[in-house]
From Swiss-Prot:
It is an enzyme of class 3 (hydrolase). Homodimer. It holds the Pfam family Aminotran_5. Catalyzes the cleavage of L-kynurenine (L-Kyn) and L-3-hydroxykynurenine (L-3OHKyn) into anthranilic acid (AA) and 3-hydroxyanthranilic acid (3-OHAA), respectively. InterPro entries: Aminotrans_V_dom, Kynureninase, PyrdxlP-dep_Trfase, PyrdxlP-dep_Trfase_major, PyrdxlP-dep_Trfase_small. This is Kynureninase 1. The gene is bna5-1. Pyridoxal 5'-phosphate binds at residues 147-148, 175-178, 232, 261, 264, 286, 326, 354. Belongs to the kynureninase family. NCBIfam families: kynureninase (TIGR01814). It catalyses: L-kynurenine + H2O = anthranilate + L-alanine + H(+); 3-hydroxy-L-kynurenine + H2O = 3-hydroxyanthranilate + L-alanine + H(+).
Length: 483
């Protein structure tokens, strides 16, 4: 609740301090904001590549060279891949040690100095830490598999097309893997995507934003034929944060199941998946949640879909069909090997195989940091951090008329409608030139050809001073190449 009140203050209260302060462009001003940052200590818990690191051609460290004083890069790409927590190595080393000295008995043998429970229970530890990040009950969350795999598993359970209801509503510019997953699910049920796939396209191609009213209108237009709506909580290209609560309630009032891809939202904004009554959701953990490339993902199933009571071994009418595997089975009977599937309650009952303990350690290493920082404080800082970057971009150089800007910010300007990411559409032919300048300055961002860059300050490790420098670099390089 705290960050929502904070958001309201930003929207309706006096301007943020840097809006009317000419000093906002100075290093000293940015450093004064950093000095007041309650999350500033967490930056030291991440390994930030140096400019020298980025140019390395070998991985082995030079033991004769002290690179601790090398300037760090400015890493604004946490929306693509988060940085490595320093604790990740400790977690993985402890796992490797357990495997080395215990072998298979490591599944059940506790240790006084363990960071995670024995192998058989690591998924429980992951779910416990993940739940508050996405606003869920612990029983509603499972850390498992990968994002697209989990979307397929969830749609296999929740997409139950009938003769009357068979359509899936999705963004026209959804992340390609989501698009492919929906297409293949429709074909799996012997239907054609051209008939069963409803694409919500931007009304104005120059402004690729989907308004809530537009989404609700599409829901109304397909109310009698849609079985499922699957949207991104935060749109990967524009950075738009959709009104999950309103859209979910409206679609459900029409009898439509609602799922959300939270890849760009988990660890970024303060989600409340349980309170918003979301049917299901899935996300990856390697972006803002820093679990490493291709790291283990997560899924959410609302508690009302997780009941598994049975009588005489038979599942009751409320049991939600799913693709099943032994790790989703009840722990008390899992090793009986009697081929009688008794699922765990909640999201855990959707698990298939035993999880990779190696990957789980990488996830938990980062989640432990989130548990100490809290999503409320992370979101509060993010609102200010992204707002500061936006201010620098739209006002620098001070004497430049707005109509002469060599870029357009296509992310909504309303803080309630975005997370940490700002997407900039550059003028024709500027992309490669701007990227070259930023690379030389050690500024790491993300590109989406032919003309968009995505800049994402992560509250746990980015600073106002970095944004002061990088924001001016971006604006200056754009103008310099444009003029």
């Amino acid at each position: 609740m705290g960050s929502r009140l904070h958001l309201r203050d930003i929207k309706h209260g006096p301007p943020l301090p840097y809006h009317d302060d000419i000093r906002a462009f100075t290093k000293e001003y940015a450093e004064s904001l950093d000095a007041q940052d309650p999350l500033r200590k967490f930056r030291d818990e991440f390994i930030i590549p140096s400019k020298k690191d980025l140019k390395r051609t070998v991985l082995a460290a030079d033991e004769n060279t002290d690179d601790s004083t090398d300037p760090r890069c400015i890493y604004l790409c946490g929306n693509s891949l988060g940085l490595q927590p320093r604790s990740t190595r400790k977690y993985i080393d402890r796992y490797l040690r357990t495997w080395a000295i215990k072998g298979v008995t490591g599944h059940f043998t506790p240790h006084d100095d363990q960071l995670l429970p024995p192998f058989v229970d690591v998924d429980v530890a992951g779910a416990k830490l993940m739940a508050p990040v996405v606003g869920a009950l612990e029983s509603e969350v499972a850390v498992m598999d990968t994002l697209t795999t989990n979307l397929h598993l969830l749609m296999a359970s929740f997409y139950r097309p009938t003769q009357e209801r068979y359509k899936i509503i999705i963004e026209g510019k959804a992340f390609p893997s989501d698009h492919y997953a929906v297409e293949s699910q429709i074909r799996h049920h012997n239907r054609e995507p051209s008939e069963a796939m409803v694409l919500i396209e931007p009304e104005d191609p120059k402004h690729p934003i989907l308004t809530t009213d537009q989404i609700l209108r599409v829901i109304d237009e397909n109310a009698s034929s849609a079985a499922l709506i699957l949207l991104s909580a935060i749109q990967f290209y524009t950075g738009q944060y959709f009104d999950i609560k309103t859209i979910t309630a409206h679609a459900q009032s029409k009898g439509i199941i609602v799922g959300w891809d939270c890849a760009h939202a988990a660890g970024n904004v303060d989600l409340q998946l349980h309170d918003w009554n979301v049917d299901f959701a899935a996300w990856c953990n390697y972006k803002y949640l820093n679990s490493g490339p291709g790291g283990m993902a997560g899924l959410f199933v609302h508690e009302r879909h997780g009941h598994v009571e049975s009588k005489n071994g038979a599942q009751n009418e409320g049991f939600r069909p799913r693709l099943s595997g032994w790790w989703g089975g009840d722990k008390e009977t899992r090793f009986l090997m009697d081929n009688n599937f008794r699922p765990q309650v909640g999201a855990a009952g959707f698990q298939l195989s035993n999880p990779s303990v190696l990957d789980m350690n990488a996830v938990v290493a980062s989640l432990e940091i989130f548990s100490r920082a809290s999503m409320e404080k992370i979101r509060q800082k993010s609102l200010h951090l992204t707002g500061y970057l936006e201010h620098l971009l739209v006002t620098y150089p001070l004497d430049a008329p707005p109509e002469e800007k060599p870029f357009t910010i296509i992310t909504p300007s309303n803080p309630a409608e975005r997370g940490a990411q700002l997407s900039l559409r550059l003028g024709p032919g500027l992309l490669e030139k701007v990227l070259e300048v930023l690379e030389e300055q050690g500024v790491i961002i993300d590109e989406r050809k032919p003309d968009v860059i995505r800049v994402a300050p992560a509250p746990l490790y980015n600073t106002y001073a970095e944004l002061s420098s990088s924001g001016i670099h971006i604006a200056y390089s754009s103008y310099n190449q444009y003029s």
